[in-house]
Amino acid sequence: MHQTHDIQILPAPVIRLIEELNRLPGVGPKTASRLTFFLLRAPDDLPLALAHALTALKQQVQLCSRCYFITQGDLCAICANPARDQRVICVVEEPLDVVAIERTGVYRGLYHVLHGRIAPLEGMNREDIYFDELLDRVRAEPVEEVIIATNPNLEGEATAFHLQRALAPLGVRVTRLARGLPTGGDLEWADPGTLGSALEGRREM
């Protein structure tokens, strides 16, 4: 639909939902319109359940105080699990990267989620992500190895370089995922087999 003309004939609540959905990543005006009209036709319980789920998401989910993954309590399920290997920390950019690595079934250590990457052109620097918090953990916890699993793109490699340089004086083994992941891609889209092989074949930095 033509946003400048056709949308003006719609009721205000419909326009508002289209505009809000259009703010989501990967959702353009046409998809936002289709979703809005689908919800308009749907039984009342579906939009209401969706609204409740969105409210619960923002009110009940927070960041783990240790690794910055997502949780409903103070510690996430991974940090709270005594069976996880406390000696190894895998550093990732985003929470979805944790989900991708867990899907491989080959990793049993802990995580540290940066919530971003070092990208000066985007205004993202070391102090804008959970970079120094990782260094504090390595100093305070019985960590022997840090696996750097940032994305295989320019920003991810730059972040890995800065991490390696900061970790070097702390006396821990620093490794990087093996080559084989699609260059320029995101970890979350890697298939479990390829990602698992990259973990098992990780190399010293």
Swiss-Prot record:
PANTHER family: RECOMBINATION PROTEIN RECR. It comes from the Bacteria. Residues 87-182 form the Toprim domain. One of its GO terms (molecular function) is zinc ion binding. A zinc finger (C4-type) spans 64-79. Belongs to the RecR family. This is Recombination protein RecR. Keywords: DNA damage, DNA recombination, DNA repair, Metal-binding, Zinc, Zinc-finger. May play a role in DNA repair. It seems to be involved in an RecBC-independent recombinational process of DNA repair. It may act with RecF and RecO. It holds the Pfam family RecR_ZnF. The keyword DNA damage applies. InterPro entries: DNA_Rcmb_RecR, Rcmb_RecR, Rcmb_RecR_Znf, TOPRIM_dom, TOPRIM_RecR. GO terms for biological process: DNA recombination; DNA repair. The keyword Iron does not apply.
